[in-house]
Amino acid sequence: MMTQQIDDPMIPVPIPQQVPAKEGIAKLPGTRLGYWDTGGDGTPVVFLHPASGSALVWLYQQPVFAKAGYRVIAYSRRNYYNSDLAAEDNPGIGSEDLHNLIELLGVARFHAVSSAAGGSVATDYAFSHPERLLSLTVSSNNLAARNGYIAETAAIIRPKETESLPRWYWELGPSYRAANPEGVERWKELNHKSETGKGARQKVANVVTPAKLETLKVPALLMAGAADLATPPSIMRMIARHVPDNEVVVVAECGHSSYWERPEFFNRTVLDFVGRHAN
């Protein structure tokens, strides 16, 4: 297990200038999803956003991964910015929306990089279409575990009262809130812009249990913020017991949004991981 070397947590990281990217609305079976794509001949990296975000939130990652030679793609799931709502009678399966999107974009194999709720979709995809993934990065998510002791423990450490707290309070760690109040406000703006409607909750194709995790065929990077109230390092260590090929990274002085709170470390760690799983 790897732990972040302590950078200075009191120095805010400025948002870098974005590189050109095509923005569009993908017309898929049963829905339309907003996305952006930097294009090019590089290996694709597809970013899957948290429930607090959308395709808009990857400001720290887009130019860094593109300049590292990758084709960078992000999209908004149903119920989020520029995408349709999920219908009550047919909400669809999030991982199949992802599959339909990459088929439309002509992507053969790719690296999936996810945060929080995006990790549930990415993991579901890894079970349904492992042949399409070069690697799987999951930050701040229990890999969609719905049954078994991991899911039960996650429920215990995240009581219902948590939902009454402001989202920014329990998603952003105390070090970040102290060091970067402007970043907190920007995060709030993106959160407000991302959550465009309350459609139905989408379904998953696979029921994830500890036994199911042991069948995962994709190399996995498991990241947890040391101060994450929702998915702390303890949950990631439980998951790591069952995932055959995994690396666990604990991000120091970080809450639930490591891609935003500690972007330089997040980017370095993920770039190193995907670089070692190119084939």
Predicted regions and their residues:
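Flexible "cap/lid" loop of the alpha/beta hydrolase fold
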Residues: 123-128, 133-163
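Short beta-strand/loop motif that positions the catalytic acidic residue
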Residues: 216, 222-224
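Short alpha-helix in the alpha/beta-hydrolase fold that links the catalytic acid
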Residues: 218, 232-241
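Acidic catalytic loop of the alpha/beta-hydrolase fold
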Residues: 227-231
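Conserved HGGG/HGGXW glycine-rich cap/lid loop of the alpha/beta-hydrolase fold
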Residues: 31-84
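Active-site loop/oxyanion-hole signature of alpha/beta-hydrolase fold enzymes
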Residues: 62, 67, 73-114, 268
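Conserved alpha/beta-hydrolase catalytic His-Asp/Glu region
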Residues: 147-148, 159-215
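Catalytic active-site module of serine/aspartate enzymes centered on a nucleophile-bearing elbow/loop
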Residues: 246-279
